[in-house]
Amino acid sequence: MADERSKLEQAGEGTNFSSDEIDRLRKRFMKLDTDASGILETNEFLSLPGVAANPLASRLMDVFDENHSGDVDFQEFINGLSTFSTKGNKKEKLRFAFKVYDIDRDGYISNGELFIVLKMMVGNNLKDAQLQQIVDKTIMEADKDGDGKISFEEFEAQVGGTNVYQSMTLDLF
């Protein structure tokens, strides 16, 4: 039991969760892991409440999947959820939001990446040409150093003054 507790404490290092919260998340993870493989495949991850209906569900899965394995292990699960906890700070939440847009994980949001993610959100409600105009205007406004892409610092300057990060808080317990 003590060994199990220390494993949970170790898993929780660097997160915003107490060991009791980690234990509750482990139990939730095990319920989601319907095939008891120790990892969440895409279909299991999408069974998280509110995720399947989210137009960015595939991007959320990719951001949680820190090692690019195509699935989410328990450590990745709690690391990702930590951002959404009530104890997650503004910068963590903005960093997560940035990663949703940074598809190739190069530390920048390109014109193409912004288009893809916005297309996921608006679907066919806008013509591609209209969406491209929005993307171009957004890049122009946010890109302060003129390199044609948005760095995290530029992203933070653009959206940090909004309350978007507040919508990234979930009551997990």
Swiss-Prot record:
Ca(2+) 4 binds at residues 143, 145, 147, 149, 154. The keyword Mitochondrion does not apply. Residues 20-55, 59-87, 89-124, 130-165 form the EF-hand domain. It holds the Pfam family EF-hand_5. Composed of a catalytic subunit (A) and a regulatory subunit (B). Regulatory subunit of calcineurin, a calcium-dependent, calmodulin stimulated protein phosphatase. Confers calcium sensitivity. This protein has four functional calcium-binding sites. This is Calcineurin subunit B. It comes from Yarrowia lipolytica (strain CLIB 122 / E 150).
